[in-house]
Curated annotation (Swiss-Prot):
Molecular functions per Gene Ontology: structural constituent of ribosome
Biased composition (Basic residues): 1-22
Origin species: Salinispora tropica (strain ATCC BAA-916 / DSM 44818 / JCM 13857 / NBRC 105044 / CNB-440)
Gene name of the encoded protein: rpmI
The family this protein is said to belong to: Belongs to the bacterial ribosomal protein bL35 family.
Annotated NCBIfam families: rpmI_bact (TIGR00001)
Any single Gene Ontology cellular-component annotation: cytosolic large ribosomal subunit
One BP annotation, GO: translation
Protein name: Large ribosomal subunit protein bL35
Protein's UniProt keywords contain Ribosomal protein: yes
Length: 64
């Protein structure tokens, strides 16, 4: 039986931490930033943990 391939698109969107948590970049920080307040753009920076209901599906796509 061949090896399972991880989902390339999902691999580019999320990262697995050392403890096994799945983190992602928040949406809304690519364009149209001029109309968004500094507070809002600052709040959107950094990585956030993926919502619990999605974790099982994402781990399956990543082959974990």
């Amino acid at each position: 039986m061949p090896k399972m391939k991880s989902h390339t698109g999902m691999g580019k969107r999320v990262r697995v931490t050392g403890k096994g948590k799945i983190v992602k970049q928040q949406a809304g920080l690519r364009h149209n930033l001029e109309k968004k307040s500094s507070t809002r753009t600052r709040r959107l920076t950094g990585l956030v943990e993926v919502a619990k209901p999605d974790v099982k599906r994402i781990k399956k796509l990543l082959g974990r």
